[in-house]
Design a protein with these regions (language model features):
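Catalytic-core segments of nucleotide cyclases and related cyclic-nucleotide turnover enzymes
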Residues: 114-139
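Short beta-strand
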Residues: 58-62, 97, 162
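Residues that scaffold the ATP/ADP-binding catalytic core of kinase and kinase-like folds
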Residues: 28, 70, 115-117, 152-153
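A general secondary-structure junction signal
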Residues: 63, 105-111, 147-151
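Intrinsically disordered, glycine/charged-rich C-terminal tails and inter-domain linkers
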Residues: 1-3, 141-180
Length: 180
């Protein structure tokens, strides 16, 4: 059980906020029955839950083949290891199901507002804030972590990662130098 399970009322906390989804999933399910997709995702959700909860995290929500999870501040290193496990073991699990899908995982660390929210009769834990938005728009073809996540890691976990700096791109100049 995660420390996040004890939050009932809205509060501000610092946490690791990862998003994940599966590459080529929409193509893969195109010629499959809804029942087949449901059975695959049912088993997949259990796999994800087991891995995330083992890292002291919480599955916030699933949306089809995608999801949002959260790890408390004191479990960032365990969370990164869980995400690594999800990438490696999850991709192997997907291959066993004969899917071409792979995990795309992106994570940011920072302040969020979280708690139970929803209709009068159905409230669920959720997280909101710029930290979540940053994680959502990160580019990744595998497992990507922001510098804010990296800074929270111990040296042994840092050694499992390498820095990736994207190539330089050029953009249109507006203003004083645009006429040259």
């Amino acid at each position: 059980m995660s420390d996040l399970d004890n939050i009932d009322r809205a509060e501000g906390v610092d946490l690791l906020a990862p998003f994940f989804d599966l590459t080529t999933f929409s193509i893969y399910v195109r010629n499959r029955s809804a029942q087949d997709v449901f059975e695959l995702l049912s088993d997949y959700y259990q796999l994800v839950g087991d891995i995330i909860e083992e890292g002291n995290g919480k599955v916030v929500k699933f949306i089809g083949d995608a999801g949002l999870v959260a790890f408390p501040e004191d479990a960032v290193a365990k969370g990164v290891l869980a995400l690594r496990k999800l990438k490696n073991e999850g991709d192997a699990w997907l291959a066993d199901w004969d899917t071409p899908c792979k995990h795309r995982i992106k994570a940011h660390f920072g302040h969020v507002h979280c708690g139970r929210i929803g209709t009068r009769t159905s409230k669920q834990f959720d997280v909101f804030g710029e930290t979540v938005n940053i994680a959502a728009v990160l580019q990744s073809n595998g497992l990507a972590l922001t510098a804010q996540v990296f800074r929270k890691l111990d040296s042994s976990t840092r050694q499992l990662l390498k820095k990736h700096t994207p190539p330089i791109t050029y953009i249109l100049v507006e203003g004083a130098h645009a006429d040259q």
